[in-house]
Amino acid sequence: MVKLVCAIVGVAGSAFPVDIDASQLVGDLKKAIKAENAMTFTGDAKDLQLFLAKQPVDDESGKEVVPVYRPSAEEMKEESFKWLPDEHRAALKLVEGESDDYIHALTAGEPILGSKTLTTWFYTKNNMELPSSEQIHVLVVVPEQGSSVPTVSQDGVFDHCINPFFLQFRTVDKVGDWLEFSSLLPLTRRQKLYIRSSYQVIANHALFNPNVGMVKYAVVTGTPGVGKSVFVYYVLWRLIKEKKRVLLFDNNGLFYFDGSTMLICLALPSKFNEQFWSPDLWCLVDSMDPTSIPGLPYRLCSVLLASTPRRDCIGEFKKQPPTADVFYMPLWSKEELATIAPMYPHAAAVWENRFDCLGGVPRLVLQDIETDPQALLMSACSSCSLDDCIMLVSIYSEINSKTKIVQTLIHIHSQEPYRKYKVVYASDLAMQLIVRTKWRFDRAKLQSLLGSSDGNPLAQSLCGYIFEFYSMDRLEQGGTFVYRELFSGKRKRTPADGTIDIPRSSQPRQVAERVEVGQHAKQLYVPGTSNYTAIDAWMPQFGGFQMTVGKTHDIKGGAADDLAKLGQNGNRLFFLLPPLYYKTFTKKTPQTIKQYAILVPYPEVRNELSASTLQ
């Protein structure tokens, strides 16, 4: 008599002992397992699949693999294989009902036949040690209950899959943070899929269904090109490894995994076939409205939809009960992109600059790299109105040619657990180009954002750049401004406001390479390059200027040297400040520079924002 500890794969807290004689058949063990779990498993005992829980061994690369006994190898007869310790990582996850790569590997082989004796199974065929305490001995895989579906139906709905990419999913293994395929992924044309940490988090929550017997809906959305379709392949792989039924709606066709075999679906089964259409079936839909797919009875099965933020794909589906869980795919970090960049050697010299300009979107950074990133942003700015450029993208957004283009500029940002999001611009460069291109023709509306952008985070993000343009215009025109001298924090009393007259520039602002002695007095100069680090503008014999939109603005390196070249009364620095920061702005280091705060009031507010931008 031996005592075996068995565990049902995928069921938390399901480890249990079974006492049985080693001379009995595997079929007898199945009956004993069913007797111990009458409430968990209601099918026939013969349908249970049993696998040995072997302790892993390390291969040459250090990866844990399942040991395989070869009776012909003399060295294998000298030492028995060990059982899985109950403190091993895989065992701990097993008893918690979670999946694990090594558990998948143990259950990926052929289950033992019920006609074999336990002695033959354990010792003759696998050379296992004698079972003892603090071990897991047998893994039990319970087939899908109440959903026995024929693989190839009598009316020819299904056929055997011959697509090499989809055919390989059952045998694909996770290697580190990668899935390694023998065929190219249709979307990336690569043989590896990088598993982002966000993929795992989103999939865990999206596939979790606490209401057994009820359908589960989930929506995964995000910026175009961020990898939602690749994520669908990751979810497909996970469900297949867990031997779940999956129906994939893909551009290459309809693919169905019945729990053991990958098939191609030539026509959907009848919507009245409740044996097929049941909550345990996961339908994976990419960029299509599930409610409008002919023949899909979406109310009878679980559905995961991946789509860009668009009402025509998500809106109607989101209305259906039970309400879908919505997840927002995050932008890629620079570190994540660096991980996959070696797969795109043609982008090696440009991808980091493209990331700085276009944000964390792999399609734009690594794949579609023919167009210069600044030219791409300029084209988007020119094609879209200001209202388009401050449109709050959401799952209820209407999609047209302009909204597709504007999503080059506007991205969806999300953080774990990826249930909430905010809209952000692709980069600082994107914001600069929006303001620069709209300043000529939409100046009044841009200026109106300075005082009326509350509630629109995109408009608020632009305000700093708008203020720079607006302040430069005011500076060029000259006039009387409220100002105050800045002193160190040790001074107890803040000096009262006064007024200062800034002379009107004798000519329109002049572009200069740098500050030089002898430049014309009462002439406003600006640097010719955006990376000039000293001061933003200067007027000989008056002083230098910094456009400032925050409390923490510091004096740039080289400013003191530039100010010294501005002649009599020129060795002073003026910070041009919006009303929000004028009163609280303090003197900056180096404090040897004479510093002043100038109040630049916002223009009179006229609310010219269209209602659509605030929806």
UniProtKB/Swiss-Prot annotation:
Motif (HVLVXXP motif): 137-143
Region listing for DWL domain, in residue ranges: 55-136
Entries under Pfam families matching the protein: Crinkler (PF20147)
Keywords annotated in UniProt: Glycoprotein, Host nucleus, Secreted, Signal, Virulence
Glycosylated residue positions: N531
InterPro entries: Crinkler_effector, Crinkler_N, P-loop_NTPase
Signal peptide (from-to): 1-17
Subcellular location: Secreted; Host nucleus
SUPFAM superfamilies named in the record: P-loop containing nucleoside triphosphate hydrolases
Transport as UniProt keyword: no
Region annotation (LQLFLAK domain) ranges: 18-54
Any one Gene Ontology cellular component term annotated for this protein: extracellular region
Family from the record: Belongs to the Crinkler effector family.
Function: Secreted effector that elicits necrosis in host plants, a characteristic of plant innate immunity.
Record's comment describing the protein's domains: The CRN proteins have modular architectures that include a signal peptide, a conserved N-terminus, and highly diverse C-terminal domains. The conserved CRN N-terminus harbors a distinct LXLFLAK motif, which is followed by the conserved DWL domain. A highly conserved HVLVXXP motif marks the end of the CRN N-terminal domains and forms a junction where diverse C-terminal domains are fused. The conserved CRN N-terminus mediates the translocation into the plant host cells.
Name of the protein this chain belongs to: Crinkler effector protein 15
